[in-house]
């Protein structure tokens, strides 16, 4: 099997995520209101999830010569039973893809992302989280379209579309795409100017007491409590940056934050699509991503990181201090 040129794959993947980001902004504008927020209505993010998955898969299929297996979150079964949601998804998809699909074609496309393993026969495969950060999406806050290309069960290309993320710290302009390609570095692209790529690097902060952590808005399990324990052990004084989704990886890769830790429960296993894209982007920006036992992330065991305990992401310079404090703060 001939393999596509990685530069072409990178270009097509960026375009796919860009289309998805623009669709997400439109879906938020049209479907999310104060009323849906107050009612905790999940339907806008459901429309977004399915629309983005269909758009990204369609762009990959149209733009690339080789069709790699795709592991994504959604399939068509649930959607087909929600006709009102399905009609909205079809409308948004056709608008942003310039297609004229009917329901059956949409279902077939969505199910292209239903490669429920075994991927051992495939050297390369995609993993996609259409909207990572459901709560952020519904609040019109931070969320990400997360796409990664895997090779031999390791991420070699990551794209994070962050439609609501400021283009720089303190900027009022929002909308970024982050891309990392193995051995080629990481870059940020503004949604307002897709022709210009800006190289990004992790911070050079080496003083543990000055480290800036990033964590989720909402604590799950003992996550925030443990993070505070570890940061206190390091002598950190700054408040953590609270942000939803894999945008946390982008913050570390761009140098806005120095560390991102995630451990909610000792027995909880992370989904591969929640980390693959951010992982390679941080590494190519000069950072490091392991688990709490300092083990490499193992993407070979299905949909979850079955062999790993949590996530430790840093600018690399702070890694020794982080793990010294981790050892003092939790027993495995």
Curated annotation (Swiss-Prot):
GO MF, one example: 3'(2'),5'-bisphosphate nucleotidase activity
Positions contributing to Mg(2+) 2 binding: 129, 132, 274
Binding site for adenosine 3',5'-bisphosphate: 134, 245, 248, 262, 274
Lineage: Eukaryota, Amoebozoa, Evosea, Eumycetozoa, Dictyostelia
Protein name as it appears in the record: 3'(2'),5'-bisphosphate nucleotidase
Active site: 49, 134
Top EC category: hydrolase
Recorded superkingdom: Eukaryota
E.C. code: 3.1.3.7, 3.1.3.57
Annotated organism of origin: Dictyostelium discoideum (Social amoeba)
């Amino acid at each position: 099997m001939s393999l596509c040129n990685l530069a072409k794959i990178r270009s097509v993947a960026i375009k796919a995520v860009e289309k998805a980001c623009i669709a997400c902004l439109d879906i938020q504008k049209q479907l999310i209101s104060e009323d849906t927020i107050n009612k905790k209505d999940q339907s806008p993010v459901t429309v977004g999830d399915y629309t983005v998955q269909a758009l990204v898969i369609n762009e990959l299929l149209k733009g690339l010569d080789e069709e790699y297996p795709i592991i994504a979150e959604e399939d068509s079964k649930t959607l087909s039973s929600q006709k009102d949601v399905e009609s909205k998804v079809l409308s948004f998809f056709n608008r942003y893809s310039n297609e004229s699909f009917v329901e059956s074609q949409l279902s077939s496309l969505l199910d292209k992302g239903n490669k429920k393993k075994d991927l051992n026969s495939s050297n390369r495969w995609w993993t996609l989280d259409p909207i990572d950060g459901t709560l952020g999406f519904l609040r019109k806050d931070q969320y990400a379209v997360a796409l990664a290309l895997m090779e031999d069960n390791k991420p070699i290309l990551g794209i994070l579309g962050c439609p609501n993320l400021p283009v720089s710290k303190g900027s009022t302009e929002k909308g970024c795409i982050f891309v990392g390609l193995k051995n080629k570095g990481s870059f940020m692209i503004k949604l307002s100017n897709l022709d210009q790529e800006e190289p990004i690097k992790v911070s050079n902060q080496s003083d543990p007491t000055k480290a800036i952590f990033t964590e989720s808005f909402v604590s799950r399990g003992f996550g925030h409590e443990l993070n505070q324990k570890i940061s206190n052990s390091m002598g950190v004084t700054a408040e953590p940056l609270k942000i939803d989704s894999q945008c946390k990886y982008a913050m570390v890769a761009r140098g806005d934050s120095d560390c991102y830790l995630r451990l909610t429960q000792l027995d909880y296993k992370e989904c591969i699509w929640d980390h693959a894209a951010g992982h390679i982007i941080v590494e190519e920006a000069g950072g490091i991503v392991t688990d709490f036992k300092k083990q490499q992330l193992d993407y070979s065991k299905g949909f979850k990181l079955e062999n790993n305990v949590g996530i430790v992401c840093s600018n690399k310079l702070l890694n020794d201090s982080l793990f010294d404090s981790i050892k003092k703060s939790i027993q495995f």
